[in-house]
């Protein structure tokens, strides 16, 4: 039996501002944007040409979900953006105003830095060794 993770839900405040951040600042591709009803859309994004695992931008619909925006993992890094050229992507993201929470560092597993999205969700930018 073949199985894989198809999408990971990321709670956002607004579909359009989230799409803009991810496509303009992180150079993600908008895979799908389908209106389901007056308030809900099916919005999938992914880095470049990656489509096997996508991020589902899910607009918060309840006060409980709104509280989780930017903190779905209780302050820990939530998502890991792997790159084949750390310094290229780090400088490109920095020039576009992405907020980095630390200086890049070398770890036994690779070069890494923590950054935040527009809502405070923590990500690792990571080039594995």
Predicted regions and their residues:
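Vicinal oxygen chelate
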Residues: 1-7, 29-82, 90-118, 126-129
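Conserved beta-strand-loop-alpha-helix junction that forms the acyl-donor binding cleft
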Residues: 12-15, 36-38
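Helix N-cap motif at beta-to-alpha junctions
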Residues: 14-15, 84-87
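Conserved active-site tyrosine of GNAT-family acetyltransferases
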Residues: 18-23, 93, 120
């Amino acid at each position: 039996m073949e199985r894989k993770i198809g999408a990971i839900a990321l709670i956002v405040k607004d579909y359009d501002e989230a799409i803009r951040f991810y496509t303009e600042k992180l150079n993600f591709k908008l895979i799908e944007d389908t209106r389901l009803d007056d308030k809900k859309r099916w919005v999938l994004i992914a880095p470049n040409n990656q489509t096997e695992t996508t991020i589902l931008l899910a607009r918060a619909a309840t006060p409980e979900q709104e509280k989780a925006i930017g903190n779905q993992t209780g302050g820990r890094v939530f998502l890991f953006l792997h790159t084949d050229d750390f310094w290229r992507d780090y400088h490109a993201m920095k020039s576009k105003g992405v907020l980095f929470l630390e200086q890049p560092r070398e770890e036994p597993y690779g070069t890494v830095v923590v950054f935040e999205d527009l809502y405070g969700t923590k990500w690792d930018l990571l080039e594995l060794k």
